[in-house]
Amino acid sequence: MPKLEMMLLVLLILPLCYIDAVGPPPPWNMEDEIIEHWQKLHCHEISDLTPWILCSPEPLCGGKGCCAQGVCDCSGPACTCPPCL
């Protein structure tokens, strides 16, 4: 087998071995991207967002759509924020 054919064969087989060794790519999670996008738009000043991200899905206190974790009430089936003053 000539060198060129051997090189082409190696180049075709090598990526298959690499893909098998690494495994398939992780599944794409649209929900995580939506939450991340919402956080970037509305909650710049708060660092730990995940515990209360569902607490205030619409603009409430300060027009940011966020309320602090300390005032977020998650005792019932859903989390709620206090009314704005």
From Swiss-Prot:
Expressed by the venom duct. Residues 22-40 form a propeptide. Keywords: Disulfide bond, Neurotoxin, Secreted, Signal, Toxin. It is found in: Secreted. Belongs to the conotoxin D superfamily. Probable neurotoxin. This is Conotoxin Lt28.5.
